[in-house]
Amino acid sequence: SFRALSFCQSALANGHQIINVFFYQDGVTNSNALTCPASDEIDMHSNWQSLSSQHSIPLTNCVSAALRRGVLSPQDATENGKPQWNSSDAFTMGGLGELVVGIEQADRLISF
């Protein structure tokens, strides 16, 4: 995740546009608002949120991967009868359809 974030920051600094970041498999854990990294570790969740808010970049979680890993939005928690959620507002849940739309809109796909 750090490599992906660094790549995004570098791409933006060099004038490129990022239209969406799609998190899949273990990448969905970046949206978990309840992570508490040690003081000498990078807070990936906060860094992704900052990138999104500073550059208006949508952050999309694969909903299937997120649910399998216990990462829930408020809607997912309600639909699955869970009393709590842990995905922050900066991240939305979506399916592979959102990934396909992003691929169609972009001139390239970078995968980490």
Model regions: which residues?
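N-terminal beta-loop-helix "entrance" segment that forms/cooperates
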Residues: 27-41
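A generic local structural motif
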Residues: 9, 45-47, 94-98
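Short beta-alpha junction loops
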Residues: 25-28, 65-66
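A glycine-rich helix N-cap at a beta->alpha junction
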Residues: 37-66
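N-terminal glycine-rich phosphate/adenylate-binding segment common to multiple enzyme folds
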Residues: 63-112
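Short coil/turn connectors at secondary-structure junctions
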Residues: 15-19, 55-57, 105-107
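Histidine-anchored nucleotide/phosphate-binding helix
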Residues: 1-21
